Amino acid sequence: MLQPKRRKYRKEQKGRNTGVATRGSSVAFGDFGLKAVGRGRLTARQIESARRAMTRHIKRGGRIWIRIFPDKPISQKPAEVRMGNGKGNPEYYVAEIQPGKVLYEMDGVDEQLAREAFKLAAAKLPLQTTFVIRHLG
């Protein structure tokens, strides 16, 4: 699963996910892309699950790019622990997703196969997505 090799600080504040994606909002590597319409967080497990679904569907053909990386640690307190006594330990990592962000890209397959693969991947993700095609020029 994806996670940072090392961080300057182990824990991070919650923060607010506002605005729309300006960087990473167009298809750059492949011919087809899966773009976020909604806003939210994707865990490393969700990103990997969607990647596996796509990879299985396109079999050996094509190439997939993951355009997001889970670099934000989410901490949790253990079960049945009283409130207070500091912040919990980092349990998993998430990627903060803004509307307009391209999540995955695909190349080397026809459009119909790409649409099917992205549909399988989108079912694994907790946000609304749309299929986009690269426009040259």
UniProtKB/Swiss-Prot annotation:
Pfam families: Ribosomal_L16 (PF00252). GO terms for biological process: translation. Residues 1-13 have a biased composition (Basic residues). One of its GO terms (cellular component) is cytosolic large ribosomal subunit. InterPro entries: Ribosomal_uL16 (IPR047873), Ribosomal_uL16_bact-type (IPR000114), Ribosomal_uL16_CS (IPR020798), Ribosomal_uL16_dom (IPR016180), Ribosomal_uL16_sf (IPR036920). Residues 1-22 are annotated as: Disordered. Keywords: Ribonucleoprotein, Ribosomal protein, RNA-binding, rRNA-binding, tRNA-binding. Part of the 50S ribosomal subunit. PANTHER family: 50S/60S RIBOSOMAL PROTEIN L16, LARGE RIBOSOMAL SUBUNIT PROTEIN UL16M. Binds 23S rRNA and is also seen to make contacts with the A and possibly P site tRNAs. Belongs to the universal ribosomal protein uL16 family. This is Large ribosomal subunit protein uL16. It comes from Polynucleobacter asymbioticus (strain DSM 18221 / CIP 109841 / QLW-P1DMWA-1) (Polynucleobacter necessarius subsp. asymbioticus). The lineage of its organism: Bacteria, Pseudomonadati, Pseudomonadota, Betaproteobacteria, Burkholderiales. The gene is rplP.
